[in-house]
Amino acid sequence: MKKLSQNLNSDFISAANRLAGRNARRKVVAYVESYDDVFFWSNLLRRLETPDCYFEVMLPSRDSLCKGKKIALSNRLGARLGDSMIACVDADYDYLMQGATETSRTVCTSPYVFHTYVYAIENYQCYAPALHNVCVMATLNDHRLFDFEAFLGDYSETIWPLLVWSVWAYRYGRYPSFSLLDFYRVVQIERLNYYHPEQTIEQLRRRVNAKVSRLQRLFPQGRQTYKPLREELLALGLTPRTAYLYMRGHDLFDGVVGPMLGGVCEALRRERERDIRRLAGHEVQLQNELSAYRHAVAPVEEMLRKHTGYENSEPYRRVQDDIRRFLERGKATPPPAAARPAPPAAED
């Protein structure tokens, strides 16, 4: 006999909602890709709950550690989605592919699948306007040592032509010749001059231009399709100044923003400790204050994963709008009619 969980679908949840009574709040189960995603989606969905509806965020499998978009959108689960059961996933390149693959078609067209628009949750965590506050959270020092927004804007403008080529390679099946890893090897920041970031950008620009030239020679057919794709990406909401939000998330987190914040936070901590040493009246006070400060600060990577400063970003608001429309559709859809009893048998 099949497990109950295998028969669990949107209709089952809807029936359970009806059993709870007419005045009870409707529950919507939201499946996410992995436990790492639970906080992000729970925080987003919780703020959109209404007096009539609430969400419960779950993993797609309770009896295994399998995770990822393929599990969250598997045929077994996909057919079970509906007004009371949804899937919440990273967009990856599927949003930009606009239906070129089966997964992309599901992500872009299913009314019960919601995606991040940006590549992944890590991209939201690296949202440039929020990074200064992340440094404050990690170091308890509000001194602005580095302009994160300006740097990531310049970084994005520099990698933008190559990002379009990366999407092109996946859209037209040429990714074995130009994979996401190949893209990352060009755009990673190995060393950042915090005092002259323009030097780092110029080195990056030379690498990007060289790679673009090689791709143009390798794929001459791209002359007819590259520019239309670029215009399509712009219409989808990408801009040259925000291209970093659409590159692979863990590459951005681990290879660009994480190390960049690490260096800034280390300088901020040293600065705060110098202030403590300068202001301490005696050795005991110095040691007490240093100990208290070091106990109060936090690892920057932990703060980068926990902050919610991206909630004012345009892509995040688009996700919220999608959820609001889903809730409005649910209110407008009448519940299935209750089963009627069979008519009495006719008397002879």
Stretches found by the model and what they are:
Residues 1-348:
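Acidic, divalent-metal-binding catalytic cores of TOPRIM
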